[in-house]
C-alpha cells in the first residue's frame, strides 16, 4: 500500500482509500517490527512511507466499499497481505462487485500479492466467469508462499498461510489457460505482468516496479 501511494502521490495523483465499513486500515505490525528477530519485515524506506501514510487524511478516513463509484476513478489497486484480518477484504462481495464494474468500464485494474485473490473471486454475472478468466496475470507464487511459511512456521504457525490453498493454485483454477499465470522467472527480481488494462505483481519486492507501471499506464491514457 505505502509504496504505490507514495509514488502516485509524488506524481500528483489523488489516492483514495476504501475499507468495508469506512474504518481506517492498519498495517500488520510484524511488517514494521520484523516477522522473526526483527527480520523479514518491510524495507526501511517502505516503513518510512507507511509512517507518512498514517498522516494522510484519505488513509485515515477511507470510504466504504459500497461508496466506490468506478466511473469517477482512473484505476483500482488491490493490495496484498497475509494476516488473518485480510479475509474481510479478500472475501467481500461488495468489493468483488465493484471490481467487476471497473473491468466493464475498461478501467485500469491492478493487484499485488494476495490482491489477485480478489480478482479471481470477482465473477461477472453476465458470463458466470471471473473477470480475469481470459487474462494473463501473476500473484503471490507458491514458491514464495512456501518459503515464507517454512521459514516461520516453527514460531508463527500458519501466519503466512491465509488459506489452506496456495494463492497461485486458487488463481490458476479461474483462468481459461492455467499457463496464463506467470511466475516471472527469477522470484527475487522485480517483476510485473501487464495484460492490456490489468497490472499484476507478486510480492513486496515488486512494489516499486508495480507502482511505476501503474503510473506509466495512467500517463499513457492521458495522451
Predicted features and spans:
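Catalytic nucleophile serine of serine hydrolases
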Residues: 113-115
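Conserved, well-structured core segments that form or line functional sites
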Residues: 109
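Extended, subdomain-level signal for the structured scaffold at the beginning of enzyme domains
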Residues: 1-105, 118-223
Amino acid at each position: 500500500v505505502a509504496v504505490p501511494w507514495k509514488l502516485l502521490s509524488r506524481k500528483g495523483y489523488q489516492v483514495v482509500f476504501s475499507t468495508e465499513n469506512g474504518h481506517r486500515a492498519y498495517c500488520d505490525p510484524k511488517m514494521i517490527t520484523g516477522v522473526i528477530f526483527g527480520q523479514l519485515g518491510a524495507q526501511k524506506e517502505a516503513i518510512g512511507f507507511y509512517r507518512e501514510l498514517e498522516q494522510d487524511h484519505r488513509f485515515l478516513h477511507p470510504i466504504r466499499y459500497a461508496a466506490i463509484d468506478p466511473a469517477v476513478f482512473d484505476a483500482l489497486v488491490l493490495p496484498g497481505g497475509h494476516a488473518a484480518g485480510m479475509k474481510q477484504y479478500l472475501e467481500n462481495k461488495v468489493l468483488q462487485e465493484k471490481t467487476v464494474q471497473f473491468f466493464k468500464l475498461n478501467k485500469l485494474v491492478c493487484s499485488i500479492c494476495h490482491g489477485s485473490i480478489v480478482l479471481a473471486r470477482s465473477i461477472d454475472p453476465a458470463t458466470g466467469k471471473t473477470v480475469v478468466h481470459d487474462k494473463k496475470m501473476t500473484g503471490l507464487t507458491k514458491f514464495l508462499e512456501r518459503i515464507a511459511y517454512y521459514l516461520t512456521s516453527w514460531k508463527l504457525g500458519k501466519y503466512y498461510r491465509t488459506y489452506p490453498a496456495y494463492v497461485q493454485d486458487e488463481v490458476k483454477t479461474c483462468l481459461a489457460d492455467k499457463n496464463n499465470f506467470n511466475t516471472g522467472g527469477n522470484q527475487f527480481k522485480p517483476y510485473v505482468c501487464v495484460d492490456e488494462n490489468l497490472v499484476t505483481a507478486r510480492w513486496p519486492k515488486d512494489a516499486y516496479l508495480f507502482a511505476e507501471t501503474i503510473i506509466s499506464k495512467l500517463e499513457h491514457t492521458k495522451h
